[in-house]
Amino acid sequence: MKLLSRSMNTFELSYAPRGLEYILKLTVPENQKGIIYRVTEVLFAHGWDIKEAIFETIEDGLVKDVFIIQSLSGISLTSDALALIRDDLLGLFREDYSVIDYIERFPDLPLLKPTKNPPIVHIYNPSSIDSTVLDIKTQDRPGLLFEISQILFLFDVDILSVTARTEDGIVRDSFLLRRDISEKLTTVTMEKIKQSLLDIL
């Protein structure tokens, strides 16, 4: 079953340098499940560590994502490198190949479980909003945001917004989640997500 519509064929991707880091901006015309999962996967596969990220859905379903990224190998982000990232995103957005097939192209990706600083995972339904809140504090490592978004995708959860920041090797991620149009997550689902996250953090 196709998860992404034809509107995903068109999106804007741009970047600007910021010291040793880069500001990467992605604008997508329609919010659909799996966007963040695919974007974080491609950046990780291309050797980019996400230092900060802000994902937001604004009016008319337009999605604007901002990433602060840094190369894991010390290379520069060039127009050619950006074009490769864009091509891979387009292939995933159009579902020319599956996420699993794509990640299998990169068998040497360093998905490692840290041994220090036990993670803190807090997931709850506040009464003030019609979304579920997920807060995570854990040791940073390459591909972490991709792994988190992968779990949420597998639970068929829509990520409305994310704020991700890394300070002194510790990442603090805050997500707004929901199912369908305005459905908060059930207690059972929240517990399953929490346990799945603790297994990989």
Indicate residue ranges for each PLM-predicted region.
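Regulatory modules associated with amino-acid/nitrogen control
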Residues: 1-201
